[in-house]
C-alpha cells in the first residue's frame, strides 16, 4: 500500500513553495514555518504568507531577531494569532539555546512553543526522515476510509493514528506523509471522492462497503454560540483613525483593533453608544459585520464618527493615518469593519465636509 501511494505521489505531487524538489534534502526551517502556517488553514491562504515571511526572514536566526510587532504585522489576516506569537517564541529558542538547529525527534519538537503531536510528526518525517505518522484532517479521512473505521471522531483518532503508523515506510517517510496529505486534498475529498483514480482503491474497505463518503464518522457538533457587540470607527478630519492594542494574552493577543464594546451573547445594543471611546456624534451603519471564530460566531454593529484634528487620543489609544491601517497588525474581523466603512457611500469622508474633507483627500494622496 505504501509503495502504491509513493508511486502515485512521484507522478502527481503538488508543487508547493515549501517542498524540496525530488532528490533534494528538506530545509527544516521551511518545513517548520509551513507546518505552523498550515495549522487549520488552507494551502491557498498560506502560500503568499509563506513567501512573504521567507523573503523577509530567510532563516530562523533573522526571524528570531525580528520584533514581536513586526511578526504580528506580517501574520495579520492569516488568523489564529497565537500561532504567530508561538512561532516567534520558537524561533528565539531555536536560534538561541539550540544554536540554530531544530530538534530532529517528535519528542524534542513537542518541547517547542506551538508544536503539537501532528506538527511534530510532520516536521520529524519531512525534515528529518523519521518514521512518524503525521495525521491531520486529510490523513484522518484517508485512513478512516481505508480501514472502514466506524468509531466517530474525535474518539477514533487513536485508532486512526495507530493504523497510520503501521503503514509508514522506513524509506521515504517524509514523502509518504506528503503523499497522504496530497491524496486527501486532491482525490480522497470530503465530498465526491475520486475513487476511480485513487492509488489505494483496491485496498480501501470503505469503498468496498460502498460508503466512503460517510467516513470518517463524526459526532454531531453543538451549535456555535453567537456573540454581539459594537465597534467604533473614529476618524479625524485629516483621515487618521483611532486604534488600540489588544492585551498580549487571550484571543487576538497583541493585535491592533478599533475601539469597541465587549462581545457578549446578551449584548444590550441600546447601551452601545454610551461605551464609545470619545464623545462625538456617532452614526450607525446600516450593515453589520459577521465573523466566525473557532468556538463562537460574532456580529458587530459599526458606529462612525468624525472628530477635529485637534482631538487627542485617550489613554491606551492612538491615531493612525488611514493609509497606514493596512500596515497594522489587524485581525480579519477588524479589516472587515474598515472595509465596510470605506464602502459605505454615506460615510463622513465620502459625504465631504468642506475644507476638512479636502484636507483628508490631501492626507490620503500623501501616504
Spell out what each predicted region is:
Residues 1-20, 185-351, 355-367:
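Intrinsically disordered, low-complexity, charged terminal extensions of DNA damage-control enzymes
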Residues 3-213, 226, 277-278:
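Catalytic cores of DNA base-excision repair glycosylases
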Amino acid at each position: 500500500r505504501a509503495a502504491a501511494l509513493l508511486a502515485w505521489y512521484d507522478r502527481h505531487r503538488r508543487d508547493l513553495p515549501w517542498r524540496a524538489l525530488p532528490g533534494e534534502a528538506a530545509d527544516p526551517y521551511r518545513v517548520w514555518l509551513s507546518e505552523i502556517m498550515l495549522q487549520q488553514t488552507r494551502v491557498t491562504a498560506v502560500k503568499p504568507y509563506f513567501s512573504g515571511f521567507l523573503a523577509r526572514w530567510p532563516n530562523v536566526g533573522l526571524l528570531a531577531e525580528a520584533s514581536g510587532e513586526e511578526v504580528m504585522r506580517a501574520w495579520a489576516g492569516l488568523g489564529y494569532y497565537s500561532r504567530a506569537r508561538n512561532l516567534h517564541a520558537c524561533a528565539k529558542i531555536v536560534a538561541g539555546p539550540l544554536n540554530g538547529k531544530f530538534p530532529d525527534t517528535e519528542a524534542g519538537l513537542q518541547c517547542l512553543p506551538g508544536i503539537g503531536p501532528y506538527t511534530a510528526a510532520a516536521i520529524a518525517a519531512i525534515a528529518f526522515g523519521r518514521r512518524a505518522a503525521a495525521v491531520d484532517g486529510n490523513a484522518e479521512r484517508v485512513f478512516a476510509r481505508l480501514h472502514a473505521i466506524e468509531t466517530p471522531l474525535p474518539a477514533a483518532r487513536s485508532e486512526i493514528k495507530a493504523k497510520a503508523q503501521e503503514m509508514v515506510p522506513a524509506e521515504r517517510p517524509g514523502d509518504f506523509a506528503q503523499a497522504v496529505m496530497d491524496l486527501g486534498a486532491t482525490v480522497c475529498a470530503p465530498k465526491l471522492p475520486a475513487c476511480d483514480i485513487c492509488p489505494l482503491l483496491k485496498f480501501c474497505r470503505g469503498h468496498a462497503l460502498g460508503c466512503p463518503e460517510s467516513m470518517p464518522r463524526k459526532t454531531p457538533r453543538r451549535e456555535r454560540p453567537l456573540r454581539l457587540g459594537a465597534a467604533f470607527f473614529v476618524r479625524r478630519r485629516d483621515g487618521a483613525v483611532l486604534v488600540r492594542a489588544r492585551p498580549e494574552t487571550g484571543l487576538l493577543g497583541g493585535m491592533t483593533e478599533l475601539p469597541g464594546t465587549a462581545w457578549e451573547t446578551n449584548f444590550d445594543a441600546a447601551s452601545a453608544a454610551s461605551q464609545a471611546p470619545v464623545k462625538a456624534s456617532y452614526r450607525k451603519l446600516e450593515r453589520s459585520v459577521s465573523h466566525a471564530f473557532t468556538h463562537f460566531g460574532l456580529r458587530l454593529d459599526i458606529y462612525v464618527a468624525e472628530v477635529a484634528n485637534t482631538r487627542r487620543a485617550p489613554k491606551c489609544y492612538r491615531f493612525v493615518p488611514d493609509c497606514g491601517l493596512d500596515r497594522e497588525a489587524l485581525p480579519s474581523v477588524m479589516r472587515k469593519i474598515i472595509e465596510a466603512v470605506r464602502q459605505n457611500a454615506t460615510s463622513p469622508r465620502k459625504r465631504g465636509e468642506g475644507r476638512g474633507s479636502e484636507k483628508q483627500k490631501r492626507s490620503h494622496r500623501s501616504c
